[in-house]
């Protein structure tokens, strides 16, 4: 992650660059080009044809710009001009008289016979009484005695040049300031800046604006950084920028290739020292006409390419490129660009072919003789500038590759983080296991639960399971439809009649009043809604409580149901049956050895035990007991069946507490 952040920061720094250049109105002398022109027009004087605005031939503005005659020029006038143009003081002023070839048209050196017939430039003053321009007076006077022009170079002279290229129109940009040559930093360097340099050097327009290390690194100070030209400036120092001696080094020296620069290459051969001659000029590649392609021209080309001397000039092919160049050399020139040349001259190249040459540095001739092997092996197939030059497209390609690599790293990091998160989620987020089989209870095994039981038990309420003990074979008594239980470790099926008794449990107060009616069971609701009283049935009422011993509580209702949800009713006669005083004989229940005490309406009733023929079981294995009620005459409406029955209570022991044995094992 830290590596990714570091690469992102580096890419941001490369793309953003250094701070923005200086404001557009800032330059060395505190004026912009328009202000400089206004100053020259206001003063009526300027320096032209020099390397900068502080060097050149002096011209004054009368009706038009006229050159100044040197007949009445003195040192005070030179100092006044330099100060007026903000080019320094007189301490660094020199007088440079141009040669006669630079005189205006019609002027001839040493020809005095035509002096009276020629009107020369007006002198700006006969004599300046001080170093300020306002003390100088312009006189309209002919230059009869001295026909030379005034050439002034002020102390603050500035110049520009291109070095280490194959011609004066290509190379590393250098500026002259304060009498010392220095370089220009390539920060924010573009074609607009390069165009100003090419125009200033009269090299056409800029073809390429090059960053550092395309040419040999320079030496000395760095005069400019973050140059921001608009392309209309006359001089490079008129462009806004900053001093370059703080954040820039010589590995970032700016370079320029102008349209008038010429570079050459040999194509179609076995190496770079053999093939068809092509020239790069004004931004395009052109062929060279062989109409005047002689040994002198071939010799200059092979020498400038570092391929030794010319050994052959094979006949070339027809021209395959649009442009055509014509050269005429003497053989001593350093490059073809210094020879006489013409570009796209149809008369000179009308019946020509593309020129070809074989130099001594070619591999074809290295095995034949070593005397003609060049002193250095060529690296490029043309001049050093176009071949070794890389423009800003390569820089953009580098940034694109860096962005792609950064994107791949980001994608890999994202996938890795997602995998880690998924692994962490699978480790700590385990599914919760829920056991619906175990029921939590606060009671210990074998202890009765006396908490109040709600009247209505929700259907979702857990079932209370009773695990009976395995009865002996001799103690079990059942009808022919008895089905033996499989007393395994699995919990037994809950008794339906037991839950019915718990749901319809009555309070102790109602039991004492002996006036309560048991609400109808859910299992026999369809029978309880009968409006008439059924006929008397001699059969005894059937209870759903199994025999548990000699003493137990009886539920005195004639309405019950089996576990198979089949309702039945033992309807007594109009009179209660006679009570059998004979106590029930003791008989162990076939389900448990210890008989439970069932609480019915809070009133205990003790019986000796049921008879053997009164006990039976259903097909589902649930026991129920048929017993005869005690000899008590309850109200007749209490024994209506299938209506809600009335309870019967027998008080055996007043000190005995009401309890309900659930039959804990």
From Swiss-Prot:
Residues 45-155, 160-259, 264-360 form the SRCR domain. Its main location: membrane. Residues 420-665 are cytoplasmic. The chain crosses the membrane at residues 399-419. Glycans are attached at residues 29, 34, 49, 111, 117, 228, 344, 367. Residues 1-16 form the signal peptide. The keyword Transcription does not apply. One of its GO terms (molecular function) is protein kinase binding. Keywords: Cell adhesion, Cell membrane, Disulfide bond, Glycoprotein, Membrane, Phosphoprotein, Repeat, Signal, Transmembrane, Transmembrane helix. It is found in: Cell membrane. It comes from the Eukaryota. Residues 17-398 are extracellular. Residues 536-665 are annotated as: Disordered. Residues 651-665 have a biased composition (Acidic residues). GO terms for cellular component: cell surface; immunological synapse; plasma membrane; T cell receptor complex. Residues 608-621 have a biased composition (Low complexity). GO terms for biological process: acute inflammatory response to antigenic stimulus; heterophilic cell-cell adhesion via plasma membrane cell adhesion molecules; immunological synapse formation; lipopolysaccharide-mediated signaling pathway; positive regulation of cytokine production involved in inflammatory response; positive regulation of T cell proliferation; response to lipopolysaccharide. After T-cell activation, becomes hyperphosphorylated on Ser and Thr residues. Phosphorylated on tyrosine residues in response to stimulation of the TCR complex. Disulfide bonds join 54-87, 69-143, 82-154, 128-136, 169-203, 185-248, 198-258, 229-239, 289-349, 302-359, 329-339. Expressed predominantly in thymus, lymph node and spleen. SMART domains: SR (SM00202). Cell adhesion molecule that mediates cell-cell contacts and regulates T-cell responses via its interaction with ALCAM/CD166. Contributes to signaling cascades triggered by activation of the TCR/CD3 complex. Functions as a costimulatory molecule; promotes T-cell activation and proliferation. Contributes to the formation and maturation of the immunological synapse. Functions as a calcium-dependent pattern receptor that binds and aggregates both Gram-positive and Gram-negative bacteria. Interacts (via extracellular domain) with ALCAM/CD166 (via extracellular domain). Interacts with the TCR/CD3 complex subunit CD3E. Interacts (via tyrosine phosphorylated C-terminus) with LCP2 (via SH2 domain). Interacts (via glycosylated extracellular domain) with LGALS1 and LGALS3. Interaction with LGALS1 or LGALS3 inhibits interaction with ALCAM. Interacts with VAV1. This is T-cell differentiation antigen CD6. It comes from Mus musculus (Mouse). The lineage of its organism: Eukaryota, Metazoa, Chordata, Craniata, Vertebrata. The gene is Cd6.
